[in-house]
């Protein structure tokens, strides 16, 4: 490989690293909401999986504790899936053209 090609690859890698850092910062600001029980339980989190809010409809507080725990878990899982999908969508443009294996998830 010639020096010019190597320098070009290094510059491209550095630019991608800077872009990834910016995208990571943006993902920390994007919020998604997961729901369960027809919206009676909601979990709001960032695309970096930081939970911001948990909302439980007061009508559930008198109900079965086990059911409420299941609804909270389901809402959390829904939020995680939405955060992952949003992150993949946002990162997709940055990784197009890279020979990444199928199912490879970014950010790392």
Curated annotation (Swiss-Prot):
Localization annotation: Cytoplasm, Nucleoid
Feature: compositional bias, Pro residues: 99-108
Region (Disordered): 87-108
Superkingdom classification of source: Bacteria
GO cellular component: bacterial nucleoid; cytosol
Family according to the record: Belongs to the YbaB/EbfC family.
Database matches in NCBIfam families: DNA_YbaB_EbfC
Name used for this protein in its record: Nucleoid-associated protein Bxeno_A2072
């Amino acid at each position: 490989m010639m020096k010019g090609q190597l320098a070009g690859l290094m510059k491209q890698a550095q630019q991608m690293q800077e872009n990834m850092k910016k995208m990571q910062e943006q993902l920390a600001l994007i919020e998604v909401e997961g729901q369960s029980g027809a919206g009676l339980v909601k979990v709001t989190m960032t695309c970096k999986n930081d939970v911001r809010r948990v909302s439980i409809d007061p009508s559930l507080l008198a109900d079965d504790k086990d059911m409420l725990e299941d609804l909270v878990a389901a809402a959390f899982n829904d939020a995680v899936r939405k955060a992952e999908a949003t992150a993949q969508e946002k990162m997709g443009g940055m990784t197009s053209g890279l020979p990444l294996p199928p199912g490879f998830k970014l950010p790392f």
